[in-house]
Amino acid sequence: MNFGLFFLNFPENTSSETVLDNMINTVSLVDKDYKNFTTALVNHHFSKNGIVGAPMTAASFLLGLTERLHIGSLNQITTHHPVRIAEEASLLDQMSDSRFILGLSDCVNFEMDFFKRQRDSQQLQFEACYDIINEAITTNYCANNDFYNFPRISINPHCLSKENMKQYILASSVSVEWAAKKALPLTYRWSDTLEDKEILYKRYLEVAKHNIDVSNVEHQFPLLVNLNHDRDVAHQEATAYVSYIAEVYPHLNQQQKIAELISQHAIGTDNDYYSTLNALERTGSKNVLLSFESMKNHDDVVKVINMNEKIQKNLPSS
């Protein structure tokens, strides 16, 4: 089991500059001093809240900043041209000595509508994008398909890692079986309930029973963390931070959804952290991605990072 960082980059009652500075400082800290942290992922949505509009650009900066960590980005590929994503991924793979992780996810309805994509073929568009990207990465070439019309071309620079480039798919009800057929690891949605994550994992395993080798697949579990000796303070900070959830779940009771998230993430005291980590086994996760962004006190963040070294030996090793 390894630890990683996960950045939503939502500027809750603070400036974008401060949010990005906190991300940079946290990544620099764990890259230098905490060997049990192996990855850092940057999330992206075209929304009123997210401030990383170009996740691969952010990843390239963090790759240049660090020496050891693997850096990844979750890219909404349906609203971008797959050849451009393949080019950028191949370039980052070469320049980072294969430390780049390619994370892929689909769009919410707002993104599909804004960029004039058809909702009724959304998953088919996603799969078509992925096929082009993966072909370009693994063979250095790609060609058109049902949704894209261009001649067979060479992607430059060529990807050095090819099929060994780490790839992750954001878990969803429409993508999980498709991901399992390709033995692609999942990054679970932080906003899904543990029960939903567990259902997706079981669906993944059910598909994998049909002669698909997933023995080396390492799913990732994102966990919002806010620990404080005063549980009420942790709850207040985390509640304020995730209040944007109304954008993602406008049809739900917002107070109820926020309370649900607080209960299922590591929000509260140290004991809440230990109990939440038990969820990893239920979802087949081998990596846990921690988001400290709701915590106001940097010293408290460092304390939690130090906790991870002490508890790592108690986590599943396979």
Swiss-Prot record:
GO terms for biological process: bioluminescence. GO terms for molecular function: alkanal monooxygenase (FMN-linked) activity. Its EC number is 1.14.14.3. It comes from the Bacteria. InterPro entries: Alkanal_monooxygenase, Bact_Lucif_Oxidored, Bacterial_luciferase_CS, Luciferase-like_dom, Luciferase-like_sf, Luciferase_bac/NFP. Keywords: Flavoprotein, FMN, Luminescence, Monooxygenase, Oxidoreductase, Photoprotein. One of its GO terms (cellular component) is cytosol. It catalyses: a long-chain fatty aldehyde + FMNH2 + O2 = a long-chain fatty acid + hnu + FMN + H2O + 2 H(+). Light-emitting reaction in luminous bacteria. The specific role of the beta subunit is unknown, but it is absolutely required for bioluminescence activity. Belongs to the bacterial luciferase oxidoreductase family. PANTHER family: BLR5498 PROTEIN (PTHR30137:SF8), LUCIFERASE-LIKE MONOOXYGENASE (PTHR30137). Heterodimer of an alpha and a beta chain. This is Alkanal monooxygenase beta chain. The gene is luxB.
